[in-house]
Amino acid sequence: MDEKKRVFEEYPVLKSLTIMAVPAIVSQLITLVYNIADTWFIGLTDNPSMVAACSLVLPIFLLSISISNLFGTGGGSLISRLLGDKKEMEAKKVFAISIWMSLLTAVAFAGITMLFCNPLLNLLGANDQTRDYARQYLFYVVGIGGVFNVMSMVLSNLIRSVGYSKEAGIGISFGGVLNIILDPILMFWIFPDGMQVTGAAVATMLSNVITFSYFVIICIKIQKNTVIGVSLRQGLPERSSIIEIFSVGIPAGVSVLLFDIANMIANKKMAIHGDTALAAYGIVTKVERLPLNIGIGICLGMIPLIAYNYAAKNRERMKQIFNCARILGVTIAVLCVIFYHSFSAAIITFFIGDAETIQLGTAFLQARCFATPFMFLCFNMVHYFNAIGRGKISFWLAVVRQIVFNIPIMLILNARYGAYGLVWTQLVADACTVLVSYVVYFWVTRKETGTKRK
């Protein structure tokens, strides 16, 4: 445990961030690869309806991520702050209650999703060509595998919060690699032709089950020397701690939920322009995840460090960690913008051979890539406020980003410029959000500095 404390308290900022962030980045990249692998393998069929169906289901899958954020981010941020404040027993109670609440919520979500499967698909814009494919994917990925996926992500966040970033990264990475291996086996060898979407979905489900099993084994192995545990025998956490879980977790979940709603609207609007446009848009939104997943990995490594030092009242180290994470994320995002704009046609061709989809996808990617640095800055700021327990600010920034800017701008640009307007929406909306975010950041920082001086 002393070694873990040195990472939080003593190591040079870049070294601490590297130790915490690199495993998270690797796991995020492998997660990205297996998500892209689904699209790539399905794209080998040259069937835009299959590709479009997977894109349609993505918002529901993201809803499950919002559940994992609710308890993984909310509980994880609080655990790191409790450890920084030397309250180990309370941190242990928070860990246990976070696990049980996430399990109950995940089971309820999977059941509701299956119960209202058809209305949900209609809401997402499914048509006669995509509905059956989307239903197959939804059943296995969310209906059966969703609980295991949520629990894996929650456990990953929680064990990272106590310094076990490497173990968290290995678990998520292992699941991703397994998914990539299972995809072609199930899609092209086990399941018959025409059921490639089902094969991809079953591969994802199985990898989620095995990943969850890994995390259970890890928790059993390290629980004696940490605050990790699922037993409620020591009692429930204080009422203030439960409120704190939700005060950070709800904004973290709502942030994903609002992004999900905006994505549903974008998909539905894009579907009006045809399956080819939707398939091209789906490929682009997968490809843009490379810099964003790296950025998310940086932020995941940043959160425990900032939360711990915030509670320990080491504001200078906290500020250095935040600045270091921001510089790294923006640099990577800018490099990806250059790469995507230069090789857009080759990138889209890698996923699908349909000429019309390639043409649209190339134009979409060249436009959409410019939003990447601004997207990173948006969620980097939200992660920062989650880390210091300022959930209300995170919530309102999420509302500003999606409700005030993204959705209205999307509707306006779609009405005026069609599919291309939808693609440019993210850049305009997130540039506006970044300006608002930094005004809020400097206001909060100045206010806290003034309070400290008094």
Feature annotation, model-predicted:
Residues 36-40, 111, 119, 154-158, ...:
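Alpha-helical transmembrane segments of multipass membrane proteins
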Residues 18, 33-34, 71, 112-116, ...:
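Residue-level signal for transmembrane alpha-helical positions in Major Facilitator Superfamily
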Residues 8-40, 44-45, 59-74, 78, ...:
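N-terminal transmembrane alpha-helices
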Residues 72, 141-160, 168-179, 200-216, ...:
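Short runs within selected transmembrane alpha-helices of multi-pass transporters and secretion channels
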